[in-house]
C-alpha cells in the first residue's frame, strides 16, 4: 500500500 506521498508504510 502507498500513502499520499507514494511511500510504502509497513509498521
Curated annotation (Swiss-Prot):
Residues 1-11 form the Albumin domain. Its main location: secreted. It is found in: Secreted. It comes from the Eukaryota. GO terms for molecular function: metal ion binding. Dimeric and trimeric forms have been found in addition to the monomeric form. Placenta. The keyword Secreted applies. Binds copper, nickel, and fatty acids as well as, and bilirubin less well than, serum albumin. Belongs to the ALB/AFP/VDB family. It comes from Bos indicus. Glycosylated. This is Probable alpha-fetoprotein. GO terms for cellular component: extracellular region. Keywords: Copper, Glycoprotein, Metal-binding, Nickel, Secreted. The lineage of its organism: Eukaryota, Metazoa, Chordata, Craniata, Vertebrata.
